[in-house]
Curated annotation (Swiss-Prot):
It comes from the Eukaryota. It comes from Nicotiana glutinosa (Tobacco). Pfam families: Metallothio_2 (PF01439). The keyword Kinase does not apply. This is Metallothionein-like protein type 2.
Amino acid sequence: MSCCGGNCGCGSGCNGCGGCKMYPDLSYNESTTTETLVLGVGHEKTSFGTMEMGESPAAENGCKCGSECKCNPCACSK
């Protein structure tokens, strides 16, 4: 099982880089931006959604990423 640039290896034989995007926000982009920071007071969020134990939020084509960038199950249908 490989982990290439945040993609779990879920190709044939559980290898390659065509599987789940474990870290989709980690990409390098060079640009100039202006940021505005807004501080304020809002309502307290008491519910953070429901998620089963051991379930990963990242999934692609039936291929779910588990811990250590391993796919569970290793069966991508691309």
